[in-house]
UniProtKB/Swiss-Prot annotation:
Gene: RAB8A
Entry function: The small GTPases Rab are key regulators of intracellular membrane trafficking, from the formation of transport vesicles to their fusion with membranes. Rabs cycle between an inactive GDP-bound form and an active GTP-bound form that is able to recruit to membranes different sets of downstream effectors directly responsible for vesicle formation, movement, tethering and fusion. RAB8A is involved in polarized vesicular trafficking and neurotransmitter release.
GO BP terms, alphabetized: axonogenesis; cilium assembly; endocytic recycling; exocytosis; Golgi organization; neurotransmitter receptor transport to postsynaptic membrane
Protein name from the UniProt record: Ras-related protein Rab-8A
Species assigned in the record: Gallus gallus (Chicken)
Lineage: Eukaryota, Metazoa, Chordata, Craniata, Vertebrata
PROSITE patterns: RAB
Length: 207
């Protein structure tokens, strides 16, 4: 049977329990929101095929449990990931502070050239905000990665986040396939204008 896609990208969602990783994944894969999800046990995944630059890209997106007791299970999935989204809840300062710990987990267990992005989720709950957008931007900039505020509930920036991460992975793959750039070099070449800076920031806007 012929393949129905040109690329297969494995993505990973990590972050503390309750930050909305499952809701973000469900919004992207099913375009739906369910406020009654229970905490993920171990690991689960969804698949969605998208089109970028005329290529069909199959996204296999793994949703990991945030609890410490599942850490051994979930870190085993880091190595094969091509892109990782680190998610915190803007209404939970502790989940934001723990992003640094999640970054350390990536450095220990994931591929050195994995694409990363930080998501400040639940930005629709602005009245309960504990983490400012500027704090999120500053943290992402300190790691040299992209940042977006998102809301699975209000469907803000979810699509944009996954497409941006997939586009960055594809740009990196295309460069490697060309064979004219050493690994680890600047990834800015051939990236479209809306991706030129790895520390780009995206605002949460409620319409």
């Amino acid at each position: 049977m012929a393949k129905t896609y040109d690329y297969l990208f494995k993505l990973l969602l990590i972050g503390d329990s309750g930050v909305g990783k499952t809701c973000a994944l469900f919004r992207f894969s099913e375009d739906a929101f369910n406020a009654t999800f229970i905490s993920t046990i171990g690991i689960d995944f969804k698949i969605r095929t998208i089109e970028l630059d005329g290529k069909r890209i199959k996204l296999q997106i793994w949703d990991t449990a945030g609890q410490e007791r599942f850490r051994t299970i979930t870190t085993a999935y880091y190595r094969g990931a091509m892109g990782i989204m680190l998610v915190y809840d803007i209404t939970n300062e502790k989940s934001f502070e723990n992003i640094r710990n999640w970054v350390r987990n990536i450095e220990e267990h994931a591929s050195p050239d994995v694409e990363k992005m930080i998501l400040g989720n639940k930005c629709d709950a602005n009245d309960k905000r504990q983490v400012s957008r500027e704090q999120g931007e500053k943290l992402a900039a300190s790691f040299g990665i992209k940042f977006m505020e998102t809301s699975a509930k209000a469907n803000i920036n979810i699509e944009n986040a996954f497409f941006t991460l997939a586009r960055d992975i594809k740009a990196k793959m295309d460069k490697k396939l060309e064979g004219n750039s050493p690994q680890g070099s600047n990834q800015g070449v051939k990236i479209t204008p809306d991706q030129q800076k790895k520390s780009s920031f995206f605002r949460c806007v409620l319409l």
